[in-house]
Amino acid sequence: MGSRFLLVLLSGASCPPCPKYASCHNSTHCTCEDGFRARSGRTYFHDSSEKCEDINECETGLAKCKYKAYCRNKVGGYICSCLVKYTLFNFLAGIIDYDHPDCYENNSQGTTQSNVDIWVSGVKPGFGKQLPGDKRTKHICVYWEGSEGGWSTEGCSHVHSNGSYTKCKCFHLSSFAVLVALAPKEDPVLTVITQVGLTISLLCLFLAILTFLLCRPIQNTSTSLHLELSLCLFLAHLLFLTGINRTEPEVLCSIIAGLLHFLYLACFTWMLLEGLHLFLTVRNLKVANYTSTGRFKKRFMYPVGYGIPAVIIAVSAIVGPQNYGTFTCWLKLDKGFIWSFMGPVAVIILINLVFYFQVLWILRSKLSSLNKEVSTIQDTRVMTFKAISQLFILGCSWGLGFFMVEEVGKTIGSIIAYSFTIINTLQGVLLFVVHCLLNRQVRLIILSVISLVPKSN
């Protein structure tokens, strides 16, 4: 009725100058073009200062992309790309406009007509529903689409949720409801292993940080790298334990997700520098070469160690700030955004694997020619343990995460998941054991400190 009344009032008027993304209709009024809606919410208007804003079909549920199709908003419409069906191409789909008719439902076009007629009379339909649930649920605002015989999110958006109440906003009137999407079910055993393993790692990392800071005789380029890696791992694991499930408020959750993104990328960047330093140290066994390369790297390792993650986070936050925070305070797994983390990690793991096997090859060929001081290490078991542990300290074991897909099957997937969790949560323990407890100088310092402690009678 409000819409008809407005048309009657405008029937005798001439069409005014229409703003950008609007056109004249019936020579009497302006209306926003398909894919746009007026900022005021009105369908018809005379005011040339009115703004026609792009409708984000991907976020509002108006897009008609098929299941697993990639939805990407663009000015005045959207595109659907089926590249997302193939895991390896997710990141590619996020940076190019690969559009294909088969990716749409019923080959529909990538534009959406503004369905906000009810706003003409000043009505802004909203509804709320008390719903039980925890922080790890997702509330979806829907209405019943009789022609399709199912629920639809078209024209409805989620406004706010707390522990017991959900508020929605829709641009039309119908029979509304709130669907509760439960978070993916967690394996309770894996959860316990993660919490216990990370707690032990935090203790070992704290002791390692104290060792690298206080033991002056061992302070050099190597210990600087170990210290920065230990700091990043300590902060990342601590934030993971305390903040990964703090999904409310959403802004805080997004900040936590961004910090975790930065800290874990920084961890892997320092692992890369560790691998590079290990390779150069083994290749240049002479003291003079070792010293010169150490001084050279020390000048650049801090800008590289923290600069590269900062650049990646800045670009990710600019491109998709809404992709931080899901059922947990981490990155969204759809639309290829997760590759802003997995991409750099995959590259670093591959590079460190190359460094690791080159180091083994060099040591194998030069072991007999090492100087007398180094050759005094005759315990083969200790050397073997150090060599294997170094593979995990360099982060290569994180590569198991790339094989945690449905195609491997439930049994193999469980084995990979448990191996991944146990090994990587104990990375801090291995770092402390290899670089502190198995370091002869550190052991001598610890023994000297213990000897100074007065014994009680």
Curated annotation (Swiss-Prot):
Segments passing through the bilayer: 192-212, 224-244, 251-271, 300-320, 337-357, 385-405, 414-434
Boundaries of every GAIN-B domain copy: 134-186
Signal peptide: 1-14
GO MF annotation, one: G protein-coupled receptor activity
Domain spans labelled EGF-like: 15-53, 54-104
One Pfam family per UniProt: GPS
Disulfide bonds: 15-24, 18-30, 32-52, 58-71, 65-80, 82-103, 141-168, 156-170
Keywords: Calcium, Cell membrane, Disulfide bond, EGF-like domain, G-protein coupled receptor, Glycoprotein, Membrane, Receptor, Repeat, Secreted, Signal, Transducer, Transmembrane, Transmembrane helix
Residue ranges, annotated region (GPS): 141-186
Residues bearing carbohydrate: 26, 106, 162, 245
Biological process terms in GO annotation: adenylate cyclase-activating G protein-coupled receptor signaling pathway; cell surface receptor signaling pathway; G protein-coupled receptor signaling pathway
Cytoplasmic side: 213-223, 272-299, 358-384, 435-457
Ranges per topology, Extracellular: 16-191, 245-250, 321-336, 406-413
Highest taxon in the source lineage: Eukaryota
Post-translational modification: Glycosylated. Proteolytically cleaved into 2 subunits, an extracellular alpha subunit and a seven-transmembrane subunit.
Positions marked as site (Cleavage): 173-174
GO CC aspect terms: extracellular region; membrane; plasma membrane
Job description of the protein: May mediate the cellular interaction between myeloid cells and B-cells.
Sequence similarity: Belongs to the G-protein coupled receptor 2 family. Adhesion G-protein coupled receptor (ADGR) subfamily.
Subunit composition and interactions: Forms a heterodimer, consisting of a large extracellular region (alpha subunit) non-covalently linked to a seven-transmembrane moiety (beta subunit).
Name this polypeptide is given: Putative adhesion G protein-coupled receptor E4P
Protein species of origin: Homo sapiens
